C-alpha cells in the first residue's frame, strides 16, 4: 500500500489540514475506487487509532484519508487543542471535498468511519453531509454530553466563561482541561504506552471547548439519519450505553449494531483480536453500501 502525505483545506475556516492518504496495493490511476474518511478519538492525531482502521480498509481495496483536525497535530488553527464539534464536522466536510476531487475516487462511493468521540461526530456528518453514503461508528462515545460522565472533566461554567473572556481581551492565559488523566487506567494503558502515544498528542484541551461540547446532543440529530449505518461497540466498553442510545435514535431499519465480546472501549482502538472481529462486519458493510 502507498501512503502519501497530503494537504487539503477546511473551506469554512480556511485552515490547511495535514492528512495521510492511503492507496490500495496494485493501485491503478485509471480506476474509480470507493473511499472512506477515517477519524479518531477526541484530541487524537492522525497516526493513532484512525490509522489502524485506515490501514485495514485500504488493504481491503478502499482509498482512505486520515487527518489531524483543525487545532491539532500538523494542521493549522489557533489556539491549539480546541475540541469543538462544529469544527470537527467542517473538518470532515473538507476531507470529503478532497477525496471527491481525486480523479480515481468515485464521488458517489465515499463513506465515513469514526472512533470514540468522532464516532459521534462522523455519525452527525452522515446526517448533514450528503456526499457521505454510509457511516460506521466504532464505540461512539457521545450521545448527550450534558448527561455523561465526561462532565466530570469540566470546570464550573462561570469560571470557564470568565477565563475565555480574559484571554480574548488579552488579560489572561489559556486554561485547559485534562481529558485523559493517568489515573484512568484503561485510557492510560493506550495513550501512555507504545500502543497509542505520539509526540504530537496531548491530553490537554482548551477549557472553553466544554461550552460547546455540553450542548452537543447527538441523539436528537440522529433521528434524521437516512444512510446505511453500522455501530460497533465492546461488551465491556464504558461508552456502550451512549453507543446504544445513538444507534436506537436512527429511525430506519438499514442499520446494524454489533457487540464485540470481552472488548473494552480502548481495546477497540487497536488490539488485534477485537479490531479483527470488528472488520468481519466493517468490510462487508462498506462493500455493500458503497
Task: Outline where the language-model segments fall.
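N-terminal cap/lid segment of alpha/beta-hydrolase-fold proteins
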Residues: 1-31
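The serine-hydrolase catalytic nucleophile loop
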Residues: 43-55, 69, 242-243
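Conserved alpha/beta-hydrolase
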Residues: 56-76
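Alpha/beta-hydrolase active-site loop
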Residues: 82-103
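Alpha/beta-hydrolase fold nucleophile elbow
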Residues: 104-116
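Alpha/beta-hydrolase-fold enzymes
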Residues: 123-194
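Short beta-strand/loop motif that positions the catalytic acidic residue
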Residues: 225, 231-233
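Catalytic histidine-centered segment of alpha/beta-hydrolase-like enzymes
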Residues: 263-276
Amino acid at each position: 500500500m502507498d501512503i502519501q502525505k497530503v494537504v487539503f483545506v477546511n473551506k469554512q475556516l480556511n485552515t490547511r489540514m495535514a492528512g495521510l492518504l492511503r492507496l490500495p496495493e496494485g493501485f491503478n490511476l485509471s480506476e474509480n475506487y470507493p473511499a472512506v474518511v477515517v477519524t479518531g478519538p477526541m484530541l487524537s492525531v492522525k497516526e493513532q487509532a484512525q490509522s489502524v482502521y485506515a490501514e485495514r480498509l485500504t488493504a481491503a481495496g478502499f482509498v482512505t484519508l486520515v487527518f489531524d483536525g483543525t487545532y491539532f497535530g500538523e494542521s493549522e488553527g489557533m489556539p491549539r487543542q480546541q475540541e469543538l464539534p462544529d469544527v470537527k464536522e467542517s473538518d470532515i466536510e473538507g476531507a470529503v471535498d478532497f477525496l471527491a476531487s481525486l480523479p480515481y475516487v468515485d464521488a458517489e462511493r465515499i463513506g465515513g468511519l469514526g472512533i470514540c468521540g468522532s464516532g459521534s461526530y462522523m455519525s452527525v456528518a452522515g446526517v448533514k453531509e450528503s456526499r457521505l453514503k454510509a457511516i460506521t461508528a466504532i464505540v461512539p462515545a457521545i450521545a448527550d454530553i450534558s448527561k455523561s460522565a465526561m462532565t466530570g472533566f469540566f470546570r464550573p461554567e462561570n469560571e470557564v466563561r470568565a477565563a475565555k473572556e480574559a484571554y480574548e481581551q488579552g488579560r489572561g492565559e489559556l486554561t485547559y482541561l485534562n481529558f485523559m488523566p493517568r489515573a484512568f487506567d484503561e485510557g492510560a494503558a493506550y495513550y501512555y504506552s507504545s500502543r497509542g502515544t505520539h509526540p504530537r498528542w496531548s491530553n490537554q484541551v482548551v477549557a472553553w471547548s466544554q461550552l460547546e461540547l455540553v450542548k452537543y446532543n447527538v441523539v436528537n440529530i440522529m433521528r434524521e439519519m437516512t444512510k446505511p449505518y453500522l455501530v460497533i461497540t465492546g461488551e465491556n466498553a464504558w461508552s456502550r450505553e451512549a453507543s446504544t442510545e445513538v444507534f436506537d435514535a436512527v429511525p430506519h431499519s438499514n442499520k446494524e449494531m454489533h457487540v464485540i465480546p470481552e472488548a473494552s472501549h480502548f481495546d477497540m482502538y487497536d488490539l488485534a483480536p477485537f479490531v479483527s472481529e470488528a472488520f468481519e462486519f466493517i468490510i462487508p458493510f462498506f462493500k455493500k453500501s458503497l
